[in-house]
């Protein structure tokens, strides 16, 4: 079954709603150099991580200036996993993986022919849509990309692939059917307004992402 990560949680209320909806992972954005309404302070990130119950994965989402800074941030927040954004060299991603106790996810851009170079040094690849001027390089574009191409990419690499970019309750079932990803990631697609989740949309997204297809209809 495809796993679900609800990302960009900023409050305890939204965090609790994602957990109650059955999300497998919760994404908490901290210490990024781009403007986003989904970023929280390191202190809030630590508190939300601490509020994450057993069997739900807390994911620290960050865009580090240096690999050493990423390692320090992981030690401070103590997440179950860390997701790295930005133009981080492969060697720096490998450094983070070697010096942190948690799995490392590297965000890559859909269509980037060199993205597979990270596959041997991290634990998963998150394939997101190309950045817009508003979103910068930190995701949250609200735009989908070529899912068939991402499916082909996922088939080429041994590393688990997380699908992101423009996913909503309305399209996530089709996305899962097309890509068959290890997991899907949603942020803006389940928001009432930037930085605030629509709890009904979160529940609908999780339900549709994890629904078992009826074999009689295939």
UniProtKB/Swiss-Prot annotation:
Transmembrane segments: none annotated. Its EC number is 5.3.1.24. GO terms for molecular function: phosphoribosylanthranilate isomerase activity. One of its GO terms (biological process) is L-tryptophan biosynthetic process. The keyword DNA repair does not apply. It holds the Pfam family PRAI. Pathway: Amino-acid biosynthesis; L-tryptophan biosynthesis; L-tryptophan from chorismate: step 3/5. It comes from the Archaea. Keywords: Amino-acid biosynthesis, Aromatic amino acid biosynthesis, Isomerase, Tryptophan biosynthesis. It catalyses: N-(5-phospho-beta-D-ribosyl)anthranilate = 1-(2-carboxyphenylamino)-1-deoxy-D-ribulose 5-phosphate. Belongs to the TrpF family. This is N-(5'-phosphoribosyl)anthranilate isomerase. It comes from Halobacterium salinarum (strain ATCC 700922 / JCM 11081 / NRC-1) (Halobacterium halobium).
């Amino acid at each position: 079954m495809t796993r679900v990560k609800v990302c960009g949680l900023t409050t305890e209320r939204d965090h609790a709603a994602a957990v109650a909806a059955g999300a497998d992972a919760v994404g908490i954005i901290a210490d990024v150099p781009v403007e986003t309404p989904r970023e929280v302070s390191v202190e809030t990130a630590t508190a939300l991580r601490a509020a994450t119950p057993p069997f739900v994965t807390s994911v620290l989402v960050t865009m580090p200036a240096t690999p050493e800074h990423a390692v320090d941030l992981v030690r401070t927040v103590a997440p179950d996993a860390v997701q790295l954004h930005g133009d981080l060299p492969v060697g720096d991603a490998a450094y983070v993986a070697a010096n942190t106790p948690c799995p490392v996810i590297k965000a890559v851009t859909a269509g980037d022919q060199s993205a597979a170079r990270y596959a041997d040094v991290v634990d998963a690849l998150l394939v997101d849509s190309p950045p817009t001027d508003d979103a910068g390089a930190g995701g949250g574009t609200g735009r989908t990309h070529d899912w068939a191409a991402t499916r082909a990419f996922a088939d080429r690499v041994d590393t688990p692939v997380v699908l992101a970019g423009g996913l909503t309750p309305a399209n996530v079932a089709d996305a899962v059917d097309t890509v068959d990803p290890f997991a899907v990631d949603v942020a803006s697609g389940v928001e009432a307004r930037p930085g605030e989740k629509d709890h009904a949309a979160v529940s609908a997204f999780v339900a549709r992402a994890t629904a078992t297809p009826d074999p009689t209809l295939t």
